[in-house]
Amino acid sequence: MSTGRPLKSVDYEVFGRVQGVCFRMYTEDEARKIGVVGWVKNTSKGTVTGQVQGPEEKVNSMKSWLSKVGSPSSRIDRTNFSNEKTISKLEYSSFNIRY
């Protein structure tokens, strides 16, 4: 994924009804469609957290999806993004669900 454009990395946490509604599976599918890498997992406090990396415009598309769309049965109350930074190379080769 060497695009010549800056690569971005951002951590996220999604709040709402996001567990037990296939949120991680849909997140993995959407990330692969958009073309970003990283990971997603459930937390013990009922949220979904993870990291996204890729070209800035693709990361922004994924941020929008994580904030507004989600899985069909989910209800997103809010999404927090943190540690957004420019990176020199991707730290992951694909997007995966972590357990």
UniProtKB/Swiss-Prot annotation:
The modification Phosphoserine is found at S93. One of its GO terms (molecular function) is acylphosphatase activity. Keywords: Acetylation, Hydrolase, Phosphoprotein. SUPFAM superfamilies: Acylphosphatase/BLUF domain-like (SSF54975). Its EC number is 3.6.1.7. InterPro entries: Acylphosphatase (IPR020456), Acylphosphatase-like_dom (IPR001792), Acylphosphatase-like_dom_sf (IPR036046), Acylphosphatase_CS (IPR017968). It is an enzyme of class 3 (hydrolase). It catalyses: an acyl phosphate + H2O = a carboxylate + phosphate + H(+). Residues 9-99 form the Acylphosphatase-like domain. Its physiological role is not yet clear. This is Acylphosphatase-2. It comes from Bos taurus. The lineage of its organism: Eukaryota, Metazoa, Chordata, Craniata, Vertebrata.
